[in-house]
Amino acid sequence: TNFGGERLKLFSGSCYLPHPDKEDTGGEDAHFICTDEQAIGVADGVGGWADVGVNAGLFAQELMSHSVSVIQEEPKDSINPARVLEKAHSCTKAKGSSTACIIALTDT
């Protein structure tokens, strides 16, 4: 994206610290950063699934992993976060659910 004649660049970082009670399972959340594609995403797994023996973190991790794959297949400057999430969800086989957000900085 151009701003005053200059191209914008997304700089991001992350740190993931699961709740101490959920460290053994790795927590219920997942995220990604695609530097070249200027996209980031986060999924917050629904912890209530633990009541029926499902690790919601696996769903969130798989959803974000598939999101990265979909983004890498998209044309670089036309990433559509809603489409990415829809495609990633259709590939996700783990049980569970999550809230999710994907953003991408593009020239369009």
What are the roles of these predicted feature ranges?
Residues 1-108:
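PP2C/PPM-type serine/threonine phosphatase catalytic domain
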